[in-house]
Amino acid sequence: MSQTAEAKSLWFMNGHVTVHLAMAENAGGISITEHLLPTGFGPPYHVHRDEDETFYVLDGEIRCKQADRVLNAKAGEVVHLARGIPHGFKVVSPGGARLLIVSTGGFEAMLRAASMVAASVSLPEPREPTPEMQSRLAQICAENGIELLGPPID
């Protein structure tokens, strides 16, 4: 059993993240995060040098692209995204989506560095990223072994 004093409720981009298990709380080097995301949400197309990510779709539907392969995943389905292979995803369901992401490596550190502590378990006010915000995200990602390759997928 473990519990961290670090913030567990974060606003990342236009989504909300709850850290259920921090890397510091286990010897296995994994994090488990829950993501509440609005329709149309998608991170820049990117590649992780050190992390594998496994998405379990709790609610809604997402479209994932890994290299040249594209698939949709609905509630109850799992998508594994291996390190070293470019990927991205987009929320395609009208009511948004809720994902559980199990990740190895420094994904959680990037989330914490690029997020604000959330005032509540809710979506933040939506906003378009400014060039400064995009530059800051690219720098934080690079510091955590993630290379941004392009815009979010369609």
Regions found by a protein language model. Give the residues of each.
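A short, N-terminal "cap"/entry segment at the start of jelly-roll beta-barrel domains
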Residues: 1-30, 123-154
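Ligand-binding loop in jelly-roll beta-barrel domains
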Residues: 26, 63, 83-109
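A contiguous, mid-protein "functional segment" used to position or interact
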Residues: 94-140
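Short histidine-centered beta-strand/loop micro-motifs
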Residues: 21-24, 44-49, 90-92
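Conserved short histidine dyad/triad with adjacent acidic residue
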Residues: 18-19, 33-48
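Short acidic-glycine-tyrosine-enriched beta hairpin
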Residues: 25, 61, 68-86
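Conserved hydrophobic/aromatic beta-strand scaffold that supports enzyme active sites
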Residues: 19, 32-34, 54, 70, ...
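Glycine- and acidic-residue-biased ligand/ion/polar-headgroup-sensing regions
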Residues: 50-52, 56-62, 76
